[in-house]
Amino acid sequence: VELLISPKNKIYKPCSSKAFFMDTTQYFYSMKDVLIVGGGIAGTTLAWQWHLQGKSIHWIADDAVSSSHVAAGIFNPVVLKRFSPVWKAEEQLEVLVPFYTQVQEQLESQIIDLLPVWRRFHDEKEKKTWIRKSVREDLDNLMLTHPEDTALEGIEAEYGYGVVKNTGWLDTSAFMENSMVYFKSRNAFSKEVFKYDRLKIKDGELSYGDIHAKAILFAEGNHLPKNPWFKHLPMQGNKGQILIIKCPGLKLEQIIKSSVFLMPYQEDLFWVGATYDRDYNDETPTEDAKNFLISKLETFLKLPYQIIEHKSGLRPTTEDRRPFVGNHLEHKNLHVFNGMGSRASLVAPWAAKLMFDKMYSGVEYPAEMDVARFQN
């Protein structure tokens, strides 16, 4: 189709009955609603939150290995050491399943599995504590009161289990990798290292190379300290290590939680983890962590198994164990979305919805997660 350029810098495009015109600046580039930076659970969740709401995005992520690639993606609304609810658990659960279900439908592949978590009791005292706490108003929707005494072949559990409701796991690798393919096919994803000095901020608009956006959302995990606009936030890395084991004799339809989690992963493969270490020298797996996981696993797994893989990653955690969500004090269209920690698969969909609602409807963030708590 021939394009006609008018003397007034307008483009006219002939069609069947009439011509229409647009400003040349809009012809040569389209303004995205948001530019998203970061490829972990956080960045992937933001991409889908905006896309599912009909907003235009461009998403940039690199090949760096993050804790998201190591994580089991277990979503569990109960702190299983103290038998207490996770912060904002009920609100997070309201968002979680509808969000991941919508993503599954778009990807046409399964990314979540709604498996129960069985908390193995170590003694009779724990069992009694579970029964007592499970009837509390803030826990009765999260914990079954009656202990589970079903014997599982290969698992030693003399005192039985407490069953947590509304649990399961997100296949983090499938979620992230399939999402990148999905958005790349729509020219909305670039695999590259984000260069801060290439971001131009002018008159309330942003440009990064030939990408133009109304706002940018940084979801960079442990790269946050390198971000010139948000490096003041007190990020604390937390190293986590896990094992993938092969145990053909073990048949599980639930996630077992004892000193460590034991989760069915693929046929005859199980995820074991994880460690939590704030003092570390690098991201590589260590023999000490491997031995720790083995020792904890063998207190209750009584079947032969083979270690297939030993992985490690750094979790983006915060001093107060609350996410970093909000905008820059001076540049209002620069936003941060970080610090989801070890419960990212549970927290991120809810936090992403809050960010969307804040940006487009003015809904306020909970004070505990708003980065304004560090900007005064």
Give residue spans per PLM region.
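Active-site substrate-recognition segment that forms the wall
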Residues: 42-53, 73-74, 79, 110-111, ...
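Helical element adjacent to the flavin cofactor pocket in flavoenzyme catalytic cores
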Residues: 163-215
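Short beta-strand to alpha-helix junction loop
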Residues: 84-92, 162-178, 284-288
